[in-house]
């Protein structure tokens, strides 16, 4: 009705998960209404085949998110935080979708960058090494005594405020405290979408698909 002939869709999803698939279904249903339809990559880019596969998007997100978390926690560098016994946990949603490997890839990316004190977790505990219990064990075994929890989500909504930082016994904050392994557990309630450098990745993805 508005005379648009060429449609470009920029998903604001984190990855190629179930909601991205639903978007693709919706867009494809209207594809014949336009001369061209292009859908850009979500934040973490292409999924890749296994847990060891990383890409430029994952590296950029890992660096940007970690730098933001370190700064918010009051440290000059990740090394300074590590020296003070601090571990950072970035908590995603988790999924049974095949895209769950993206979380494992983000952990691989952190390891590749030498971010020894950064751990990836998920609310759903899928993949299983991202469950709250698994992450608590990993951090305790590594010897860190202070923990900072922060969402690995575009928007810090219900999951961040309740599942991560809520007062219920089954929140991550409560379970980390209840484990008795840590001297302090702090939370940072900020979504990825609030960070200008993250916004720039989405814009770059839009530009890339327009220029294809």
Residue spans of the language-model regions?
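Extended amphipathic ligand-handling, pore-lining, and cofactor/metal-binding catalytic surfaces
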Residues: 1-212
